[in-house]
């Protein structure tokens, strides 16, 4: 049994269905194994965003993602997407309903949503996403995120948005320390983030790593994705082992199951082989994920007991 906290809906679209809808094999458009940069990697989202406008498509892709999670033995997932990317034909209400309808067809996996603000959006559009998150909080949506081109839109410039997020008591996570330096992670910490997407470049600063440890801030680490975007050139250079050994709270995630052509089972296998992580480590990563999830304390307890029963 596994828990996944960092997973993008539009980066995890079923290839067979996408190919069927396009009338051709679209594997090359959806998989970005040799992207070489985050901005290049993000180009693989163009087709999914086009396909995720129709409500039937949205429901079907969501259902197939839930089936994929079930096959990967995931019992809880937080799936993120930007609501404003999918409203060419429909309202946000209809889009969210279609996603939840698709997810609910697979009763073995509990899935909550995280809305993403985008770095390249205007402040007005991101404020709209904050308003939408407020409206849907507790109705399938559990938090807000900031995603997109980190290198060209620096984290520190979004301070006002996160002041608004905090003012509205919205739980949040922030993509940081992926395509930009440890300063980006420091900015996320300054905003009060308890969870950081990727965050691997924190390793550039002992002080930042120390702050993560003392404040109990968790990193949503996505190893294969980091290889694809060339955050690290080889898995052996990934800082995950150093971070775990130092005492940083780490969770393991896929980021984008289709774009990175991966599953949690694959991620675990890679980490097992490269860093000799064992079953106890993976249990701990999953317990970290439960503790750092945006679930209620009661839901966390239930999930923890499920995991412990299964791993024992």
Residue ranges and their predicted role:
Residues 1-170, 179-184, 190, 194-195, ...:
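Metal-cofactor-binding active-site regions of metalloenzymes
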Residues 172-174:
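Conserved hydrophobic beta-strand within the GNAT/NAT acetyltransferase core sheet
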